[in-house]
Design a protein with these regions (language model features):
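Compact recognition or signaling/catalytic modules
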Residues: 2-10, 37, 42-47, 81-82
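Vicinal oxygen chelate
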Residues: 13, 65-112, 129, 140-145, ...
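N-terminal beta-strand motif that seeds the catalytic metal site of vicinal oxygen chelate
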Residues: 1-14, 66-68, 118-153
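Short secondary-structure junctions
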Residues: 25-30, 89-92
């Protein structure tokens, strides 16, 4: 078996395609009208056809039990870009206890999107502050071998 992507139901396909392109830079790789695949194997499905596929008229949006997760190597540039996108935030940008910066916001149908700083960039950011691999591993609560691997990438 092979995992091939995540499908989310959307109420307005054109609005969603525009959002995912303009905010996250995702391009359409396949467009079948009611079903659209974007870069990264994110699949958009119209709400009407999703109801048919799952044989239910009860669809719950505004659910905070899952998210689409992306990583960004230039977090400062992305956060600057995001300020001009008019998104509704789950929370403002923050730094997790392990040092990774992240932001969560909603798509047009209130699906949660997280954009986190690429973990290799977190390691390199700490290294730029003259932290040793041992110090970085302790700060991030990760194995020292992981830190050393990140530093060579």
């Amino acid at each position: 078996m092979k995992y091939t992507g995540t499908l989310i139901a959307v109420t307005d396909m054109e609005k969603s395609k525009t959002f995912y392109h303009d905010v996250l830079g995702l391009k359409v790789t396949a467009d079948f009208g009611a079903n659209v695949t974007l870069d990264g194997s994110v699949v958009l499905q119209t709400m009407e056809t999703w109801k048919e596929l799952i044989q239910s008229n009860e669809i719950t949006l505004h659910n905070c039990a899952s998210e689409l997760y992306f990583e960004e190597s230039d977090m400062d540039a992305f956060l600057s870009h995001l300020q001009n996108c008019g998104v509704s935030y789950v929370h403002p940008p923050l730094e997790h206890s392990w040092g990774q910066r992240a932001v969560r916001f909603y798509d047009p149908d209130h699906h949660i999107i997280e954009v986190g700083e690429d973990i290799t960039m977190v390691v390199k950011r700490f290294a730029a502050r003259n932290m040793t691999a041992v110090q970085i591993a302790k700060r991030m609560d990760v194995p020292e071998d992981f830190v050393r691997k990140c530093l060579t990438e």
